[in-house]
């Protein structure tokens, strides 16, 4: 059985399997591979999934992913190693050419090959904007090398150039890596983060907490969520997170 989900789904499952023995036993009984796509999966979620697997079946289930989009029909890169970490993308699918273009301090990955769309239906202007002068499709995705000394290991996701922004000071904010740092630093209490600050003087973060914050609050299990989030211990936890990331 191959199980496919987006990162938010895996986050919910990883959290539930920590305490739900029936779910953990049934869910892991037949799965041979996990596959995620749509966004980056935070390393703490990987670690939590692996902990549940080792606890229940005594080994780790293969976790893999892919990078692509509708225009690449649908994926462009895929890890070929069993030993991958969060953000690893691996190598291009056979027949696909890659071009790495320096842009805004990062490397944008661009595609050319038989699986790439020839353009947008009845959209000549959008088509012209999507391709460069060598007919490579401009993805807006940024990548780095997993190991610059061994390029056969492939590429790692480095965020979306399209979502990066500048502060009023002129400083570029690399949203993808910063979001990953906040989620990792706040685990297991942070489910997702929206990075803010476009044209402002400082970076902000809108944090979506997990139900695990209730364990910090020292309140009854049925306490209103507003009371939980305003509990001194919860506020201190997130203040410490901001301080540690500064």
Give the ranges of each region predicted by the language model.
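C-terminal boundary motif of the adenylate-forming
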Residues: 142, 185-212
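Flexible glycine-/small-residue-rich
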Residues: 100-102, 111-113, 159, 207-209
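Conserved ATP-binding/catalytic segment of the ANL
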Residues: 107-167
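Conserved adenylate-forming
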Residues: 1-106, 201-202, 209-211, 216-219, ...
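Hydrophobic C-terminal alpha-helix "anchor/cap" residues
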Residues: 49, 181-184
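A structural signal for short hydrophobic beta-strand segments in well-ordered beta-sheet cores
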Residues: 98-100, 141-145, 195
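Adenylate-forming
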Residues: 116, 151-181, 214-232
């Amino acid at each position: 059985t191959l199980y496919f989900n987006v990162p938010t789904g895996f986050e919910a499952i990883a959290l539930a399997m920590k305490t739900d023995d029936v779910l953990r036993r049934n869910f892991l009984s037949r799965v041979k591979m996990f596959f995620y796509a749509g966004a980056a999966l935070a390393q703490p979620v990987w670690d939590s999934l692996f902990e549940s697997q080792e606890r229940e079946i005594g080994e780790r289930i293969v976790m893999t992913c892919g990078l692509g989009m509708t225009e690449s029909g649908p994926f462009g890169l895929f890890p070929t190693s069993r030993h991958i970490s969060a953000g690893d993308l691996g190598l291009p699918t056979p027949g696909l050419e890659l071009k790495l273009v320096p842009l805004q301090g990062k490397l944008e990955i661009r595609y050319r090959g038989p699986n790439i769309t020839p353009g947008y239906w009845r959209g000549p202007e959008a088509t012209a904007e999507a391709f460069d002068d060598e007919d490579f499709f401009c993805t807006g995705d940024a990548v780095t090398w997993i190991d610059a000394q061994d390029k056969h290991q492939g590429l790692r996701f480095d965020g979306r150039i399209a979502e990066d922004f500048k502060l009023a000071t002129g400083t570029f904010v690399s949203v993808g890596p910063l979001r990953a740092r906040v989620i990792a630093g706040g685990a297991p209490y942070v489910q997702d983060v929206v990075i803010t600050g476009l044209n402002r003087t400082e970076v902000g973060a809108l944090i979506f907490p997990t139900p695990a914050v209730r364990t910090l609050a020292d309140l009854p299990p049925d306490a209103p969520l507003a009371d939980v989030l305003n509990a001194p211990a919860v506020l201190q936890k997130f203040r410490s997170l901001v301080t540690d990331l500064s």
